[in-house]
Structure formats: structure tokens, C-alpha cells
Amino acid sequence: MSPFLSFSRATWSELRNSVPMTLSEEDLKALQGINENLTMQEAVEVYLPLSRLLNLYVQARQSRNSVLHQFLNNDEHAPPFVIGIAGSVAVGKSTTARVLCALLSRWENHPKVELVTTDGFLYPKKMLNQRGIMHKKGFPESYDMKKLVQFVSDVKAGKPELEVPVYSHITYDITEEVKRVDRPDVLIIEGLNVLQSGMDYPHDPHRVFVSDFLDFSIYVDAESNTIEQWYVERFLKFRKGAFTQPGSYFSHYTQLSEQQAIEKAQQIWRDINGINLTENILPTKERAQLILRKGQNHLVEEILLRK
């Protein structure tokens, strides 16, 4: 017997329960990823019901906190509700995170929603080169997990004005910029590794993981060969866009013909991203409380909710 309840898209959409759509077409256009066509229908049928579910969880947490504060006779700032979003490279988890961030921030009871990606906790390019693991970027050993866990722990502890490193997909490195996170009501953490636990880090044993701090977790899923296809399509779009920008780490790929670019993207998938998905990301799927399963057209076709 499966630990998940399965919903078709049509059945799931009925759980919206008349919640109004607070995003415009322009909002959605700004939120979608380079390789996705996020429609209003997708937002209404999939993400509105999900935002309603998450809002109910947040309300329950806030009610519990108010009881505790009343009992203790204090008015300390309540810890944030932390949502983790995991999935493969190119599966669309960043778009999911941005849409949920926008929707949740419009609910009356928790207007302050922050989104942080784990990319900012990758080791700098120089350190990855020194350790000889540049080709393992995105694998467990390429992250400063102690720093990431400390950040999430500090957020949960209610510490103000926390700083998060900012990662650039143009320079392929950590920048000097920082993002400030100041006691949000809801924190969304998006990344390849947010559902990983001790068994995924045998090389660097520590007792606490991001997954230990999550109040709700989402895994964005699709068939591996479908994600590979999306990765190749995204690579081709980057070749004509982001890779052409000044300072781009991948500027040399702009000189490739389209066929050469396709073959290069397939090689990168085969040697790096596909292996990381199979070995380190996919095994964490069953730990999620909700799975969004996508079809070939990037649209969510099935929703699995843990009982």
C-alpha cells in the first residue's frame, strides 16, 4: 500500500475551494523559468490548491504558537514555517518555488515570505578546483552543508538580519552579493539537496540536515529521459542568451554549432547531472510530503500527497 494519496490534475484542481487567483498573466511571465511556459491554467489548477494546503498548515502552526506564547506569557517572534522544494536540474523546481512564494505572500496571515536557493551554499569555484571536484558541482560534496544547516537553524531560532551568499549562473560562482533574510513568516528553500540526510553524506558526517528543519517538503518529478530532454533544450536557449553575457563562464559554448551544442549538453547530462539525479536526488523523492509529477509538456499531471 502506497504511503501517498494520488490525485489527478482535475481532482486536485477541485481542492482550490474558490480561492481567488491573485497573480496576473504578467506576474506569471516574470516567474517562469527560461524553459517553461507557465500558464494561468497551470497556476489555477495546480498551484492555487497547493498554496491553500500550505496556508492551512501555516495557520495551524501559527495557532499552536499563539497557544504556546499565551502559556509562557511572552510575545517572542514565532519561528518561520519552512518549506523545502527538491528535484533535478532542469525539472522546474525554481519556477515552482517562485510561484508558491508569490502566492503565499498574498495570503493575509503570513505576508512575509522569503525564498532562498541552496546554490548560494556551493563552495566557491576556486575551492572546487583545489579539491578536484569541479566536475562534481551539485553533488553532496560540493556544498558547504555546515554553513547551510547553520543558516536554516538560525532562521528557525528567530535570528534577525541573516545573510545568504548569492550564486551567479553567469559566472558559475559565488558572488560578493548577499541576500538578507529577516525573520520571515514562511521560508522556502529550493535546491537539489534539501531532502538529503545523513546517509547521503558519508564523506562528511554531521548530525543535523536541512531536512530536519522542514515543516513541509515538495519534490518536483518527471521521467529521467524527459528531464534530459528539457536540460538539452534549456542548454540551447542559454547558448543564445545567458552564455553570451559578459563574464559568462560558458561563453565558449556559443561557438558551437547547434548539433555540437546538443551533443555537449547530452554529454554533460550523461557524465554529471544524470548521475547526480540517479545517485543523490531521486532516492530522496520518497521522503517528500508532496510530489508534483510532470509530463513531457512541463505540465503537472499527477499530485501525490503523503497520508
Swiss-Prot record:
Keywords from the UniProt entry: ATP-binding, Coenzyme A biosynthesis, Cytoplasm, Kinase, Nucleotide-binding, Transferase
Predominant cellular place of this UniProt entry's protein: cytoplasm
Annotated localization: Cytoplasm
A molecular function (GO) term: ATP binding
EC number per UniProt: 2.7.1.33
Swiss-Prot/TrEMBL catalytic activity: (R)-pantothenate + ATP = (R)-4'-phosphopantothenate + ADP + H(+)
Gene3D superfamilies hit by this protein: P-loop containing nucleotide triphosphate hydrolases
Binding site for ATP: G87, S88, V89, A90, V91, G92, K93, S94
Pfam families, sorted: PRK (PF00485)
InterPro entries attached to this UniProt entry: P-loop_NTPase, PanK, PRK/URK
GO cellular component: cytoplasm
Pathways per UniProt: Cofactor biosynthesis; coenzyme A biosynthesis; CoA from (R)-pantothenate: step 1/5
Gene Ontology terms describing biological process: coenzyme A biosynthetic process
Family: Belongs to the prokaryotic pantothenate kinase family.
Protein name, entry field: Pantothenate kinase
